[in-house]
Every structure is written in C-alpha cells, then in structure tokens.
Design a protein with these regions (language model features):
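Flexible, low-complexity linker/loop segments at domain and module junctions
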Residues: 1-6, 93-96, 290-296, 375-412
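Condensing-enzyme catalytic core mediating Claisen C-C bond formation in acyl metabolism
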Residues: 3-7, 34, 213-290, 299
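Conserved beta-ketoacyl condensing-enzyme motif
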Residues: 6, 21, 27-161, 190-199, ...
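Conserved small-residue
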Residues: 8, 26, 80, 101, ...
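A glycine- and small-aliphatic-rich helix-loop capping segment at beta-alpha/alpha-beta transitions
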Residues: 20-27, 110-126, 176-179, 199-212, ...
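Active-site-proximal alpha-helical scaffold in enzymes
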Residues: 76-89, 139-142, 147-150, 156-191, ...
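Glycine-/small-residue-rich "gating" segment that lines the acyl/pantetheine channel
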Residues: 124-130, 171, 175, 192-248, ...
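Acyl-CoA/ACP chain-elongation machinery
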Residues: 181-227, 260-274, 304-311, 326-378
Length: 412
C-alpha cells in the first residue's frame, strides 16, 4: 500500500482563524467560551458557546459565495483555502482526477433549514422558498463546493457519523490514497451548530453545560464537577498526499497518517458504551492498521466532551488499551475549542499533528479535580501545556449513534 502524509493544514475555529493563531491559543490554554452573541439565548438553559471571533467572511469569500452557501460550507471553504495554499501543490502539474475531496459534517446546513422554516411560518405558510434552500442544507455540499471551486475531479463525497464525521472522512481519505485511487485528497470536517434550534435541541438532551455564571470554565473534561459540553463551530481541513508524490515535488511534510479505524458501540443513540467496548476495539484496530504497538503512542487527544458518562467511559477505554504505557500523555482540547461536532476530529487531528511537529502537549483547561472514577494510571495533562517528544499521536472521536472514529499520526 501507498504511504500517506499530511502536507497542508487549515482551520477556522473559536481558538483561531488560521493555523498559527489557533496553535498559539491552544498551547496557551485559552478558553473561548462566552455569552452567545448570534441570537438572544437568555431564554435557553445554556446562554454561552464558543463562537468564532474577529472574523469577517467577506475577507475570505465573495458575496455570492456567502449568499449561496450555509455557514458550515463557508467555514469549510475558508479552511480549505489555507490548507491548499499551505500544501503548495499545483493542479496544472497533475491530473485533476488525481485530486479528491472527502469532508465530514454532522449537521450540514442545519442553520439554513432552521431559518427557512422560520421564514415559511412568518409568511403564513405560503410555499415561497429560497432557490438555494436545498443545496445549502445538504451535508455533501462542503466537499462539493471545494471541488467546484478548485477543479478537483477525483473522488468526492461526504462522511456523516455525527461527531466522528471528520475522522471517518480522514480514514476514507487515507485508504483511497493507500489503494492508489488518488494522489491528493482534501479532507476534514465542518459544522456551524450555534443556532437556536441546535442549542435548544442539545439542551433538551441535557448534553450542554448550564454553567452560565462562569462560561469560560464550563468545559472541564474528566473533572469531578463536569456537567456537559461547550458548543463550538468551525472547520478543520488537511491535505493528505501520497508520500512519494509529496517527496517528488519537494513538499513540506508535517507527519504521516499511520492508520485509522472505526467501530460501533451498538448500545444507545446518544450515550457511549459505559465500559467503552467499541472505543477499545477501535483504538486496537487503528494500532493494528498502523502496525504499531500501544507502548509506541505518546499522546492521545481525547474526545472527552465534559459529559459525566462520556468522559468516564473514554478514560476506561484509554486505560484498557494503553494502561501499561507510562509514557502516554492525554489531554482534552474541547475544553478550549468547544465541541465542533463533525469538525471536531479535524481540528483535533491538527492538534495531534502539531504535537508531533512541535513537541508540545496542549492542556486540558478548567479541570481542577480529576474524577476519582477515572483510572489513576492515566496521565491527563491539565492546566498548562507540557514539552514532550511525540513520535505517535492518536485522535479519538465518538458520535451519536455509537460511531467511534480513531486516527493515528506519526513522525516521518
């Protein structure tokens, strides 16, 4: 099989709107939670989220692109632009059929759908609909628009597995290049879930933190007082490339995509398996796919969303797989970014890759007292980043429906 490497990175997120600022803020351990400004959330159980700040879409896209696309697709286009430019590959020097796009999203154009229903009701339920309504809502539109904008004519589809969507896309991109079906694939994830129906819906599930008096400390993964997750938004995009192709053109290589895997909990529509059975096997499959042993992994970027059930089951799963690895460090960066749903695996894979390139483990912020039920043999990095040599890093993502998506990266 072909080897696959990462040659480009791009991000739009609450922690930063380009890779440099994003990584700086992540390493610094800065919270990005604040009162929701996009709508009046005072009547909701949760009044806060991790919104993207200091960002003007017109600086990145033209008016027609903004008008015709849902916010999640706009985020994907902006992050893709940074990643593609970072990679530096030139389409005119290769076949357009050798470049594909595989993006993940959990909710797609959810905000567009919500607004159209609101307009429909406001117009007395008269059948007058925006002609862009349907394409704006489609979950595949991020991958479609990236290919249309840049002329990539290879493999193109979207992965939908809730909060595991980006890592599902990453696994697919890895395998298609391994199999010789593409030279380059633009991959990652995007979601824009900070809307009234989305916040209200997650409140109804009792999934979000209600710590309205202190939003900046609300997300506290693995802490004994955790009470739910912090909603985020944005996109992460990575350029995957066949190793020999990247070397031949003199590309900068961040890391190698070592392996990936997916399993299912087959347990519950929203809750993870309490003993982490699916997650355990998923991590084992990913290690096998990469040809690595558990004691070779230096860092796990945990899915850890700061929910009572999810964090505990994941900690048990990590301990079951890596319990004998005294070199392993674990951190939960959703404490800073919030939960980007279908984009979570993309930005967290970027964090894992940057941990490899820079030798830094970012912190889990806000966590003061680790839950005594969390296995004591796990080294969870809290409060501040640490310097550490990282040769292999793993990204965990788990989604509603029982989807477990795991990605492994290693130093070249």
């Amino acid at each position: 099989m072909k080897r696959v490497v990462i040659t480009g990175l791009g991000v739009v997120s609450p922690a930063g709107n380009d890779i440099k600022s994003f990584w700086t803020n992540i390493v610094a351990g800065r919270s990005n939670a604040a009162k929701i400004t996009r709508f009046d959330a005072s009547g909701f159980k949760t009044h806060f989220a991790a919104e993207i700040k200091d960002f003007t879409m017109l600086d990145h896209l033209d008016r027609n692109e903004i008008k015709r696309n849902d916010l999640y697709t706009q985020y994907a286009l902006v992050a893709a632009k940074e990643a593609i430019e970072d990679s530096g590959f030139e389409l005119d020097k290769m076949s357009p059929f050798d470049v594909g796009v595989i993006m993940g999203s959990a909710q797609g154009g959810f905000e567009t759908f919500e607004q159209q229903v609101r307009d429909y009701a406001a117009n007395g339920f008269q059948p007058h609909f925006n002609p862009f309504f349907i394409p704006k809502t489609l979950v595949n539109m991020a991958s479609g628009l990236i290919s249309i904008k840049y002329g990539y004519m290879g493999i193109n589809f979207s992965a939908v597995s809730a909060c595991a969507s980006a890592n599902t896309a990453i696994m697919d991109a890895l395998n298609y290049i391994r199999w010789g079906k593409a030279k380059i694939i633009i991959t990652g994830g995007a979601d824009a879930p900070i809307s009234e129906a989305s916040i209200g819906g997650y409140n109804a599930l009792k999934a979000l933190s209600n710590r309205n008096d202190s939003p900046e400390t609300a997300s506290r993964p693995f802490d004994v007082d955790r009470d739910g997750f912090l909603m985020g938004e944005g996109a992460g995009v990575l350029v995957f490339e066949e190793y020999e192709h990247a070397v031949a053109r003199g590309a900068k290589i961040y890391a190698e995509v070592a392996g990936a895997a997916m399993t299912s909990d087959a347990y519950h529509i929203t809750a993870t398996h309490p003993e982490g059975k699916g997650a355990i096997q998923g991590m084992k499959y990913a290690l096998h796919d990469a040809g690595l042993n558990a004691d070779q992994v230096d860092y796990v970027n945990a899915h850890a969303t700061s929910t009572p059930v999810g964090d505990l089951s994941e900690s048990k799963a990590i301990s079951a797989v890596f319990g004998g690895n005294n070199n392993l460090a674990v951190s939960a960066t959703k404490s800073m970014t919030g939960h980007l749903l279908g984009a979570a695996g993309a930005i967290e894979s970027i964090i894992a890759i940057k941990a490899i390139t820079d030798g830094i483990i970012p912190p889990t912020i806000n966590t003061q007292t680790i839950d005594p039920e969390v296995p004591s043999n796990l080294h969870i990095v809290i409060k501040e980043a640490i310097n550490k040599k990282v040769d292999v890093a793993l990204s965990n993502t788990f989604g509603f429906g029982g989807h477990n998506g795991i990605a492994l990266f290693k130093k070249v």
